[in-house]
Amino acid sequence: MTFDQRLLLVHAHPDDESIGQGATMAKYAAEGRGVTLVTCTGGEMGEILVPELTHLAADQEDRLGEHRRGELDAAMAELGVTDHRYLGGFGTYRDSGMKWHEDGHAVPADDIHQNAFWHADLTEAADHLVAVIREVRPQVLVTYDQFGGYGHPDHIQAHRVATYAAALAAVPSYRKDLGAAWDIAKIYWGAMSESRMRAALRALREAGDTTAFEGMDPDGPLPPFVTADEDLSAVVDAQEHVEAKLAAMRAHATQITTDGPFFALSNNVGNVAWGLEFFRLAKGERGELNQDGLETDLFAGL
C-alpha cells in the first residue's frame, strides 16, 4: 500500500519509540498515514525488570535482544504500525550499553562489544538507512537531538546516522544502487516540554510520590532531555491514542514496569501526560501554527 503522507522514525532500542512518540505513531497509523520505524539495535544491554527473565542478560545467556524483538513486535501491534525494520537487519548492530556520569547523564560504558552500534562505521550504517529512505520516501523524519536526549551513546549515534543518511539520500549521484534520490522535507527531534514536565512533577509530588523521577525538582534544574518551551516547534495531540501508547509500553515488559515512573505519571496527571508529544524542527519550513505558536501536525505545510 502506498500512503500519501509517510513518517519515518529512527530509534536506538526497542521501547524508545513507544515512550517517545507512541501516541503520535498510533494516531497517524489510525488516520491512514504511513508509519515506518527503524530500530538501530536489539537492546541487548538493557536492564531486565522481570526477575524470572534475568537469565537472558548479556552476562548470562545473552538472549535479551531476541526476547525484546518479540516485545517490539507486540508493541507495534498495539500501535497499529505494520512497517518496522532493524537497521541493516536484526543483529547487525548491538546495543552499546552505557553508564551514568556523576553529572546525571549517560556516557559510553567502559567495556563495549565490538559489534556495538557506538562503534559502527557512520557511512556504512547510514547507507542501510539511505536504502530505507529511498524505498519509503518519507516526507517527515523523527529522531533524537544531538545529545540523544540524555547522552546514551546509541541515541547519539542514531541521531548521527539519521542525519547523515537523510543528507546522502537526497544526492542523486550517491549510491544509485540504493534507489532514486529522495529529499526528506521535514526533520524533527523528539522533545519534552519544560512547562509540562514541571507541571507533571509538581502533580506527582503533591500526590505524595517522591520516587518517580527521583531527584527532579519541579522548581529546580531539569535534565537535558527537557526542552525549553521557546525552543519547541510542534505538538501532536494524540490523547485519544494514549491507551495504545500505554499498551505498547506494557509490551516492553523487561524494560518498563507498571509501577514505575512512567505509569505513575499517567496515573497522577492523566492522558495529557502522554498524549501530547512535542518536537523540535531541525530541517524544513514550519506550517500552520496554533495559538501557542506550535505546529499541531508534523506534515503541516506539506
UniProtKB/Swiss-Prot annotation:
Cofactor note text: Binds 1 zinc ion per subunit.
SUPFAM superfamilies reported in the protein's UniProt record: LmbE-like
Cofactor(s) the record lists: Zn(2+)
GO annotation terms (biological process): mycothiol biosynthetic process
Keywords: Hydrolase, Metal-binding, Zinc
Positions contributing to Zn(2+) binding: H13, D16, H155
E.C. designation(s): 3.5.1.103
Catalyses which reaction(s): 1D-myo-inositol 2-acetamido-2-deoxy-alpha-D-glucopyranoside + H2O = 1D-myo-inositol 2-amino-2-deoxy-alpha-D-glucopyranoside + acetate
Domain of life the protein comes from: Bacteria
GO molecular-function term, one example from the UniProt record: zinc ion binding
Similarity comment: Belongs to the MshB deacetylase family.
Function text: Catalyzes the deacetylation of 1D-myo-inositol 2-acetamido-2-deoxy-alpha-D-glucopyranoside (GlcNAc-Ins) in the mycothiol biosynthesis pathway.
Protein name, as recorded: 1D-myo-inositol 2-acetamido-2-deoxy-alpha-D-glucopyranoside deacetylase
Lineage start: Bacteria, Bacillati, Actinomycetota, Actinomycetes, Propionibacteriales
